[in-house]
Amino acid sequence: MKLKKVLSVITCATLLFTAFSPLMSAYAVGETDYTIVNPYDCVDWDKWDYYKANLHTHSVASDGDLSITDMVELYYSLDYDILAMTDHGVINYGWNKPRQTNGIFNYFRKADPMSDEDYLRITTGSDRNGRGMIDITRGIEMNMAVMTKTHVNGYFTDYGQAVWGNENDYRSSVAAVDRYGGFTVLNHVGDWVNSNNFPERSHQDFYISYFANIFKDYKSCLGMEIINNTDSVTRADRALWDELLQVVIPTGRNIIVFADDDSEYVSDVGRSFEYFLLPENTEENVKQAMQVGNFFACSKFQKYTDGTPGFEGNGEVPLVSNIK
């Protein structure tokens, strides 16, 4: 897939949402020697392409407004290439596979799977010049039904089906998915920290220590969302991410960042997303990139913590054409 408007520039604003930019802040501390690892070293910029993704998506299988088919079709119609369904407490084994819902949590609605015919059409791109949209299977949002919204996305996991959550607890879900051999991402942590209302909390030792210990203990916890939907609850999460990097990077690992719609309604779709750099659009390549970080977290929205009016972009985001 060839995308227009690819810019061969690297600015501070562009690098804000890359997986490696804040490494420099850790490097500047003290006299310790640091090795800066570029997650884009693996990219063949002349041959690899960009693929647009949303990795946090809901349907009537949990608290979404659209059927599974309608939600998938909507992303497909908007030229997405990668989609993970991550309903609360419901593992996606395939858009065309039956799933078990959780009664009152999805208002006892039916969650019919996509037809095999539509599944084949979309995943092969037979009506889109052969550019299919791949199904990231075994995705789920865990810690279902907690009031404190300590939500964790699981990927490539068989854990979490119908498991009700624990209040004020991210660690348990991360630990369980780790035992099952999958991967996790911490979702919209500003919801729990309430840092959109109290941005100073992103710099407080309690929260820094809590999340840093999770990342240090579980390498399978790949990272965190730094933008969710329109950035309302995540506006201070980038500051927390920067604080966490200073603590976690010296232990030998990075914290990869994500930006996703967390879509429940039609109006949620297309707000925040990832652009993956891949040799080919396959589930295995996406899985590898999620671990390495050869993608960019992007959004049309940015909100601030100092009362400055937020930003809403129009058109396509600029894309990096090379990193040297």
Where are the language model's segments positioned?
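Short loop/turn motifs at secondary-structure junctions
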Residues: K2, D79, K219-S220
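Sec-dependent N-terminal signal peptides
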Residues: K4-A19
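Sec-dependent signal peptide cleavage junction
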Residues: F17-T32
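C-terminal functional module detector
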Residues: V29-D33, V37-W45, M71, V248-I256, ...
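A metal-dependent hydrolase metal-coordination microenvironment
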Residues: T32-F198, E225-W241, D260-S263
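Short low-complexity, flexible loop/linker segments enriched in glycine and/or proline
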Residues: K97-N102, P199-Q204, I208, S272-E274
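Histidine/acidic residue-rich metal-binding segments in metalloenzymes
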Residues: N168-Y180, F206-K219, R235-G252
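Structural recognition of alpha->loop->beta junctions
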Residues: S202-S232, L278-N285
